[in-house]
Amino acid sequence: MYKKIKLRDQQISELINLESKRQNSQIELIASENYASEDVILANGTSLSNKYGEGYPGKRYYGGCTFIDQIEKIAIERVKKLFKIEYANVQPYSGSSANAAVFAALLKPGDKILGLDLNAGGHLSHGYKINFSGMFYSGISYFLDENELLDYEAIEKIALKTKPNLIICGYSAYSRKIDFARFRQIADKVNAFLLADIAHIAGLIAAGQHPSPVGYAHIITSTTQKTLRGPRGGLILTSSKEIAAKIDKVVFPGIQGGPFFHTIAAKAVAFKEALEPWFKEYCAQIVKNAAHFASEFIKKGIRIVSQGTENHLFTIDVLSSYNLNGKQAQILLESVNIITNKNTIPNDTLSPFVTSGLRLGTPAMTSRGFKEQEFSQMAEIIDFVLRKKELNALEIKEIKKKVKILTKNFPIKKSYWP
């Protein structure tokens, strides 16, 4: 496929090759990024891209759907087995699309959504004003306590006072485990639906490295590209036949047209991989690496939000630790081929475009084979760069050399994990 692109569109071909080289030559520490396997990438770039077919298996509005029906059925059965749940919709184009479908299925315009404050680790699609979820629904926030942990009693008080129609748990920058059972207790007290958005931790849940929301959340949404190592896409899970029927009607014809069958095939491949024994080892290593990585910074006196991690990510308070904002830290590290992202922290005083924090994650480099030793090296390099603030040409050259050795020893195409 890429060869044909090169022959017919040299400009795009060159940019694809440059991006591939960039990924291979840089250390990827963005918590929401990962490396899909060759099988997933191959499945995502097939003749399935040519096929259109609205509806669901056996109930399409177009002919010629024999094989795509089988593919979608396989994807559904695999993800149901993976999460031990009764119903699944694998058609959502993204995690935000999945959330939009849930809101449309269960809520009326103006209904109340209770989610974690964005600065504290929530997500735009959890009721934030500039997002559709805050435009069509009334977003209410809960917050972390003084130790930067979920305060379930405080959340319950807010819920009892505001009477939300939907409560969301599941985050983009929260490094501790979530008590889904406690959230369900809160939801039941106010007769609210409970949505678990597990976009970041889906792989960890499937591998038994984080408690599962199945049996507690009325409905579950996720992306497929993060810790699941699949293609970019979304999914919706539920144990309720009634909710499943509502979701199916909203996904199509409610908010989407024809599914991306090439992506559904790639999802199916990723789900199969996640059912393999090695995937549990991989996710266990993600968690070990993150805990070790965070502890290395803590030893150096660096402030980590909530003082550690129990999943795949953590956030450094770079403003108090290095007298840098998140944007400055991100740019500094990218200058030596280490890719991170600026991130807000609880009670952040800086704008989301600047931030006081820097979020770090271990899934991508764990995919390439990094273990505790390599993450110790990364902590040393990152700490040095952020303390120096201004690197001279020789220092930049030396650090880039260290990064090059690591990326060469742990290439993407020879990932430690199948």
UniProtKB/Swiss-Prot annotation:
Q: Which GO terms describe its biological process?
A: glycine biosynthetic process from serine; tetrahydrofolate interconversion
Q: Indicate the principal place this protein occupies in or around the cell.
A: cytoplasm
| Catalytic EC class | transferase
Assigned GO CC terms:
cytosol
The chain residues annotated with the modification N6-(pyridoxal phosphate)lysine are K226
Q: Which UniProt keywords apply?
A: Cytoplasm, One-carbon metabolism, Pyridoxal phosphate, Transferase
Q: Where does (6S)-5,6,7,8-tetrahydrofolate bind?
A: L118, G122, H123, L124, S351, P352, F353
Query: Which co-factor is required?
Result: pyridoxal 5'-phosphate
**Pathway stated in the Swiss-Prot or TrEMBL entry:** One-carbon metabolism; tetrahydrofolate interconversion
Q: What is its EC number?
A: 2.1.2.1
Gene Ontology MF terms in the entry: glycine hydroxymethyltransferase activity; pyridoxal phosphate binding
Protein function: Catalyzes the reversible interconversion of serine and glycine with tetrahydrofolate (THF) serving as the one-carbon carrier. This reaction serves as the major source of one-carbon groups required for the biosynthesis of purines, thymidylate, methionine, and other important biomolecules.
How does this protein assemble?
Homodimer.
Q: Which PANTHER family match?
A: SERINE HYDROXYMETHYLTRANSFERASE, SERINE HYDROXYMETHYLTRANSFERASE 1
Q: Which family does it belong to?
A: Belongs to the SHMT family.
HAMAP family reported in the protein's UniProt record:
SHMT
**What name appears for this protein in its UniProt entry?**
Probable serine hydroxymethyltransferase
Q: Which organism is it from?
A: Mesomycoplasma hyopneumoniae (strain 7448) (Mycoplasma hyopneumoniae)
In the UniProt record, what gene is named as encoding this protein?
glyA
